Swiss-Prot record:
This is Hemagglutinin. Binds to sialic acid-containing receptors on the cell surface, bringing about the attachment of the virus particle to the cell. This attachment induces virion internalization either through clathrin-dependent endocytosis or through clathrin- and caveolin-independent pathway. Plays a major role in the determination of host range restriction and virulence. Class I viral fusion protein. Responsible for penetration of the virus into the cell cytoplasm by mediating the fusion of the membrane of the endocytosed virus particle with the endosomal membrane. Glycans are attached at N25, N26, N38, N179, N180, N300, N494. It comes from Influenza A virus (strain A/Korea/426/1968 H2N2). The gene is HA. Residues 16-525 are extracellular. Belongs to the influenza viruses hemagglutinin family. The chain crosses the membrane at residues 526-546. It is a single-pass type I membrane protein. It is found in: Virion membrane; Host apical cell membrane.
Amino acid sequence: MAIIYLILLFTAVRGDQICIGYHANNSTEKVDTILERNVTVTHAKDILEKTHNGKLCKLNGIPPLELGDCSIAGWLLGNPECDRLLSVPEWSYIMEKENPRYSLCYPGSFNDYEELKHLLSSVKHFEKVKILPKDRWTQHTTTGGSWACAVSGKPSFFRNMVWLTRKGSNYPVAKGSYNNTSGEQMLIIWGVHHPNDEAEQRALYQNVGTYVSVATSTLYKRSIPEIAARPKVNGLGRRMEFSWTLLDMWDTINFESTGNLVAPEYGFKISKRGSSGIMKTEGTLENCETKCQTPLGAINTTLPFHNVHPLTIGECPKYVKSEKLVLATGLRNVPQIESRGLFGAIAGFIEGGWQGMVDGWYGYHHSNDQGSGYAADKESTQKAFNGITNKVNSVIEKMNTQFEAVGKEFSNLEKRLENLNKKMEDGFLDVWTYNAELLVLMENERTLDFHDSNVKNLYDKVRMQLRDNVKELGNGCFEFYHKCDNECMDSVKNGTYDYPKYEEESKLNRNEIKGVKLSSMGVYQILAIYATVAGSLSLAIMMAGISFWMCSNGSLQCRICI
């Protein structure tokens, strides 16, 4: 009877409770931190784009310049097989095949060709301007051509150039000049012809020992043709050597030659600058649009990093070599074990989160005579959400000094420089990747610590309100020493709990509970004595009964001596 009394007594003593906890869900998202790997979190954001669409697209609505089977040189010089490129609109980038078929139809070389290609990475449109019309060279023949550049079975030549040869038996000094009044810089290309032998030199130019000089305010170049036998290319042993310069606004370029000059008929006014580039690709333009293009395909993403290809054009994420960059945005995901109950050993923020709280990251669970329920703490959740929302922007801001990997090209004579450049770019990308990965690890560590701190702050905020009107249960929960209805619970949650209002009731109940504990110890002692005495009496009675039975049937003889 006493045991039943005690059970009822302790059941009656248990009071209303409120617990501080955090959100949990069924997420399997994992992140890495400085100290841990594969930490399961409630929410995470992958910030590394790994995919592309495999297509070459318009960039911001502007199509690329698709060279097809022509090279950059073939386009600018005017290879007859590239006539469709004689007039081109604005481009977003340039598509060039790895080994284009039509380049220099007349065999030769293009000085500083790689630098010219690099120049094109900042140009989005050339306006072709006639600078030295063909009919101005009245003392020279301007119809020179070659079977190497044949079109429709007839000899031809580069469309944008004029090959000056002798007229009759004379080749007077050829002079020409152009003053750049276009308002923009102008690309100007010229050439020098190198014959196969002296007989060819005289047949074309009459003169031997000729020169070609080109001069601007910043350039003076004098070339002497090199007469020599060479292996045949495209059926020719002779060569043409092309050079280029940028003519500044209001500057003048002067040409003078006693023979072997390939003069420009057209120059290229740089009418629009901007971020461009040359995509080495065998693909063709497709009906699609993008804001970021790589040689492998377009990237359409809002993520801050990608690992598709180091060469990009447009509004692109930062390139890194990483395989994984995931930012934690939520909390450690440690769902409570439902079978053990809310107020069991796993309750609160110490041992598990609440899947039942879905409208916030941190909050409360209360239990009283009116029932129980979850409620998120909107203020702390909103502050945390605002901080996490800015995290990706913070990462981007910290990494805003992106190293731009430019696809530079080098001639065969500069392979050592090319190898050195590649090693430098690889080194930069390695460092850049390491910085990005380290930043993500550090941010993840800070995020998880930030959430832990927010839960602790919420717990401390409640504890400071309730003070000694409650008992801390040690698992994130408080047990009230007074009755706390739903209105009382709401006041705790919104920070308006009236401590003095419940102080006396809590004090009385706190003392009563202490008295119950003391009296319960006395009851336990009485029960122990009672059990001992009762057990001894029962044993004595049982022994006496057995002895009496044995004496009555002769199994035991009893002698009484006086």
